[in-house]
Swiss-Prot record:
It catalyses: oxaloacetate + phosphate = phosphoenolpyruvate + hydrogencarbonate. Its EC number is 4.1.1.31. GO terms for molecular function: magnesium ion binding; phosphoenolpyruvate carboxylase activity. Its cofactor is Mg(2+). Keywords: Carbon dioxide fixation, Lyase, Magnesium. The active site is at 137, 545. GO terms for cellular component: cytosol. Disulfide bonds: none annotated. It comes from the Bacteria. This is Phosphoenolpyruvate carboxylase. The gene is ppc. It is an enzyme of class 4 (lyase). Forms oxaloacetate, a four-carbon dicarboxylic acid source for the tricarboxylic acid cycle. InterPro entries: PEP_COase, PEP_COase_bac/pln-type, PEP_COase_Lys_AS, PEPCASE_His_AS, Pyrv/PenolPyrv_kinase-like_dom.
């Protein structure tokens, strides 16, 4: 391992020692000895010692019930501490080259070398748009209380990272670290109760408060410095290159716990939190802006000549307005019926105008250094977060809208909307959208399901404009799916046009996406409504579950490419919204590469992407990490727009079509067509046990009685990650590549790997998955948990995995996996020593728990801890 990582290694070692001391103090030397024996056996086993491997298995199988939980917790907590040390390494002065994105300054130099003009680069900066959508997917296993402790551990590591510390200072920091490690050890790592949608929303607000509030203005300050140095250009104060939206409290797709009332509550809570955070900012400005010299315009705004401190007076006025707004929102949250104050804050302009007036006056009076301090940071927060704090997307499944309108047409005696042809549906919807009379009768009493859909639309209509970002339609298939939502919003009295984004997420729907949008854009009423802007969401996880990762990736690429060209031809600005999971963005290179691997022109309308579960913490959990992640995104988008990747050659497209079809066939031959597959999946993974983990507010299944197709994509991936077969992330891909090689295309594949970012990223992601997969552990799960009649199926899958690894290494022309990303390879290797015992123990615990009708509480608790620990070891769960 490179010398660069020695600081991280020593931090990991130090935290491990502190954890060991804590375990010894809490449970005695014998438990620590047992943990240490297991660790040494695991290390030796990883180095290839077969005797150590067998002894490791025997030791873990023979643990007494009293030892199960302490051993599981020891390895799980160590992995959490390792992740914390690694996260600190990414921002420490000793480690920034390891995982930070390429510096923006270097990017500008490279762009100039490519003969791009400063004006081109400035235009690209002006158009920069990054919208990150925080989602409460149940992949964040770690409890919030433990996250806070780990954040403080990070702070201690930062404090220790100074060579000039006096002994007493170092001792004080070490004492605090010991306390934090002990607090973590004595805290239950598994939640007792499933979080409600409101709890999830509060978790999202905590990310804003603890990290983004400071991190976003700090990034923009750094970004501005790079622009000044490289392009002699300043980021305009009013620029909004970054926005945050949330699905927490708005995503009702398959989650009956997210009701219209919940969305209304979360919208109020979000506005309340915004007033709380802005009040802190304004209080600082009241204290700082004591200057008296100002422009005549500002003096008049502040109340005339008799006001001695005009800036301070204006800030006090804003403070009063925020206080009144907060009191009103608080009363509403308590369910009280209150009249809004006359100065209620509902729009960003109300906050922006007095602050910006102060900014302009300070600059005009020669006090630019003051204007560009705390005041500028607050102005940028108004632009990024504003009065809503985070905007909310509402997401609902397409059939819920169809059912609602069908119930209405039956009531009105117009027939059954659901059974009409697509052209009849469109004609009816467009006619009603153009009509001035309401369609929904006042005295109609619909079913509870339809009432809920209508009430959600009313919540949107009542919300201040700008607090709802978009309405996303999952499982969108036809143009009428989009028109139906516009009609429901119209009937609710929505006074503004809300972006309605169809989400295409199965293989067939991705293939049809361009046809659907072409039809929609051909409707005059629709073209007039959208005012030249269209958002389309591309589903990643569901399409991969449907067709396998390689076929899904290619369908996503083709769909995006076709949509870009269709919208360009129609003069429409397209925003592609990427519904990705945690597998993008492990380390700088994959995230950077993933953005550059999209079709040319796909980022012209900006980047809109989901940030899911535990990835929010890894990428935005600390202000410094936020700066690094935003720099990575900004650099990748500028590069993709100014130096777009090449259009794929005709031969490359033909090869992708060939291997995509072959990979889909192979994937479905197992997942859909093998009658034993579901039984094997349920036995070989902790899929059924995962349902007991109180992770998120959303049920793990769309239908409780269904097979794989009814499983949500996240538990599907999560379960296979736990047993280290990682099946959804590779099955079919290697077989498709082999088919192309058999067709004589190996040289073409090598060229694609070298010259086409889309393809090289696919290969890179496969390598990372293969590095995390483990054949002997997957086999051990089979031996402990699976009926012997199903062993041949498990063996077939492992043989396929081994063959796929060889194929990918041959195409990448590498001797070993992750050769070009040694930092991530090293990180995985470091974790394996601690994750392997958790995997073995998990298989043992699953075996014990499945033998008993009512498993011992200690077995169940230890099992949940191993699931959390393996998730920490793998660094991406779903």
């Amino acid at each position: 391992m490179n010398e660069q990582y020695s600081a991280m290694r020593s931090n990991v070692s130090m935290l491990g020692t502190l954890l060991g001391d804590t375990i010894k103090e809490a449970l005695g030397e014998h438990i620590l000895d047992r943990v240490e024996t297991i660790r040494k056996l695991s290390k030796s086993s990883r180095a290839g010692n077969e005797a150590s491997r067998q002894e490791l298995l025997t030791t873990l199988q023979n643990l007494s019930n009293d030892e199960l939980l302490p051993v599981a917790r020891a390895f799980s907590q160590f992995l959490n501490l390792t992740n914390t040390a690694e996260q600190y390494h990414s921002i420490s002065p000793h480690g920034e080259a390891a995982s930070n994105p390429e510096a923006l300054a270097q990017l500008f130099t490279r762009l100039k070398d490519k003969k791009l003009s400063d004006q081109d680069m400035r235009s690209a900066v002006d158009d920069l748009s990054i919208e990150l959508v925080l989602t409460a997917h149940p992949t964040e296993i770690t409890r919030r209380t433990l996250i806070h402790k780990l954040v403080e551990v990070n702070t201690c590591l930062s404090q220790l990272d100074h060579n000039d510390l006096a002994d007493y200072e170092r001792n004080k920091i070490m004492r605090r670290l010991r306390q934090l490690v002990a607090q973590s050890w004595h805290t239950d790592e598994i939640r007792k109760l499933r979080p409600s949608p409101v709890d999830e929303a509060k978790w999202g607000f905590a990310v804003v408060e603890n990290s983004l509030w400071e991190g976003v203005p700090a990034f923009l300050r750094e970004f501005n410095e790079q622009l000044e140095n490289s392009l002699d250009y300043r980021l305009p104060v009013e620029a909004v290159p970054i926005r945050f939206t949330s699905w927490m409290g708005g995503d009702r797709d398959g989650n009956p716990n997210v009701t219209a009332e919940i969305t209304r509550h979360v919208l109020l809570l979000s506005r309340w939190k915004a007033t709380d955070l802005f009040l802190r900012d304004i209080q600082v400005l009241v204290s700082e802006l004591s200057m008296s010299e100002c422009t005549p315009e500002l003096r008049e705004l502040a109340g005339g000549e008799e006001v001695l401190e005009p800036y301070r007076q204006l800030m006090k006025n804003v403070r009063t307005q925020l206080t009144n707004t907060q009191a009103y929102l608080e009363a509403r949250l308590k369910g009280e019926r209150v009249l809004p104050p006359h100065d209620l804050l509902v729009s960003n302009d109300q906050l922006w105008e007095p602050l910006y007036a102060c900014y302009q006056s300070l600059k005009a009076c020669g006090m630019e250094i003051i204007a560009n301090g705390q005041l500028l940071d607050t102005l940028r927060r108004v632009r990024c977060f504003g009065v809503p704090l985070v905007r909310i997307d509402v997401r609902q499944e397409s059939t819920r809208h169809t059912d609602a309108i069908a119930e209405l047409t039956r009531y009105l005696g117009l027939g059954d909307y659901e059974s009409w042809s697509e052209s009849d549906k469109q004609a009816f919807l467009v006619r009603e959208l153009n009509s001035k009379r309401p369609l929904v009768p006042l005295k109609w009493e619909p079913s509870a399901e339809t009432q809920e859909v209508l009430e959600t639309c009313r919540v949107i209509a009542e919300a201040p404009q700008g607090s709802i970002a978009a309405y996303v339609i999952s499982m969108a298939k036809v143009p009428s799916d989009v028109l139906a939502v516009h009609l429901l919003l119209k009937e609710a009295g929505c006074p503004f046009t809300l972006p309605v984004a169809p989400l295409f997420e199965t293989l067939d729907d991705l293939n049809n996406a361009d046809d659907v949008m072409t039809q929609l854009l051909g409707i005059d009423w629709y073209r007039g409504l959208i005012q030249g802007k269209q958002m389309v969401m591309i589903g990643y996880s569901d399409s991969a579950k449907d067709a396998g990762v390689m076929a899904a990736s290619w369908a996503q690429y083709r769909a995006q490419d076709a949509l870009i060209k269709t919208c360009e031809k129609a003069g429409i600005t397209l925003t592609l919204f990427h519904g990705r999971g945690g597998s993008i963005g492990r380390g700088g290179a994959p995230a950077h590469a993933a953005l550059l691997s999209q079709p040319p022109g796909s980022l012209k309308g900006g980047l809109r992407v989901t940030e899911q579960g535990e990835m929010i913490r890894f990428k935005f959990g600390l202000p410094e990490v936020t700066i690094s992640s935003l720099a990575l995104y900004a650099g990748a988008i500028l590069e993709a727009n100014l130096l777009p990747p090449p259009e794929p050659k005709k031969e490359w497209i033909e090869v992708m079509d060939l291997l995509s079809d072959a990979s889909c066939d192979m994937y479905r031959s197992y997942v859909r067509e093998n009658p034993e597959f579901v039984r094997y999946f349920r036995a070989a993974t902790p899929e059924l046990e995962l349902g007991k983990l109180p992770l998120g507010s959303r049920p793990a299944k769309r239908r409780p009685d269904g097979g794989v197709e009814s499983l949500r994509a996240i538990p599907w991936i999560f379960a296979w990650t736990q047993n280290r077969l990682m099946l959804p992330a590779w099955l079919g891909a290697g077989a498709g590549l082999q088919r192309a090689i058999d067709a004589g295309k190996q040289d073409v594949l090598a060229t694609m790997c070298r010259d086409w970012p889309f393809f090289s990223t696919r290969i890179g992601m496969l390598e990372m998955v293969f590095a995390k997969a483990d054949l002997w552990l997957a086999e051990y799960y089979d031996q402990r948990l699976v009926d012997k009649s199903l062993w041949p199926l498990g063996q077939q899958l492992r043989d396929q995995l081994a063959a796929d690894i060889k194929v990918v290494l041959a195409i990448a022309n590498d001797d070993h996996l992750m050769a070009d990303l040694p930092w991530i390879a090293e990180s995985i290797a470091l974790r394996n020593v601690y994750t392997d015992p958790l995997n073995v123990l998990q298989a043992e615990l699953l075996h014990r728990s499945r033998q008993q009708e009512h498993p011992d509480a200690c077995v169940e608790q230890a099992l949940m801890v191993t699931i959390a620990g393996v998730a920490a070891g793998m660094r991406n769960t779903g």
